[in-house]
Amino acid sequence: MSRRRGKVEPRHIEGDPKYNDKVISKFINCLMVDGKKSVAEAVFYDALEVIAKKTGQDPYQVFQEALENAKPQVEVKSRRVGGVTLPQFQSKFVRERRLALGIRWLIRYSRDRNEKSMKNKLAAEFMEAQKGTGSAIKKKEDIRKMADANKAFSHYRW
């Protein structure tokens, strides 16, 4: 039995110091390790500078396009019904969850790259995601294919 009576209010997040953007602030918070926010900010802004030097494009625009391309369109979940686990199927999606997954995937696959420093890893992943390639985009496509393959179970309403 639930003890809470009302809705949970989402936390208020301030925009980042440079662009005053809440999405960048969320990205920096997810990038942060051991509470070292200043280090995470430095890595993020250095990555944007690397993008500006390599491409000559607006790094803020590159980041936004990369994040938009990395956001999944569908989510797949397994469901247990009557002792049987049904395969992963497509489910409804909330905008905040799409953003969170896109951020999480960009950071995870940036850390897995072979470049020397984190700023270079992050910049490379942003540039690849903007072009529609890269590991984060591959993850998004894999999930979409899984949802398409298991569309037979999408008629269930839980």
UniProtKB/Swiss-Prot annotation:
PROSITE patterns: RIBOSOMAL_S7 (PS00052)
GO biological process: translation
InterPro entries in UniProt: Ribosomal_uS7 (IPR000235), Ribosomal_uS7_bac/org-type (IPR005717), Ribosomal_uS7_CS (IPR020606), Ribosomal_uS7_dom (IPR023798), Ribosomal_uS7_dom_sf (IPR036823)
Alphabetically ordered keywords of this record: Ribonucleoprotein, Ribosomal protein, RNA-binding, rRNA-binding, tRNA-binding
GO molecular function annotations of the record: rRNA binding; structural constituent of ribosome; tRNA binding
Function, as annotated: One of the primary rRNA binding proteins, it binds directly to 16S rRNA where it nucleates assembly of the head domain of the 30S subunit. Is located at the subunit interface close to the decoding center, probably blocks exit of the E-site tRNA.
Family membership noted in the UniProt record: Belongs to the universal ribosomal protein uS7 family.
Protein name: Small ribosomal subunit protein uS7
Organism: Leptospira biflexa
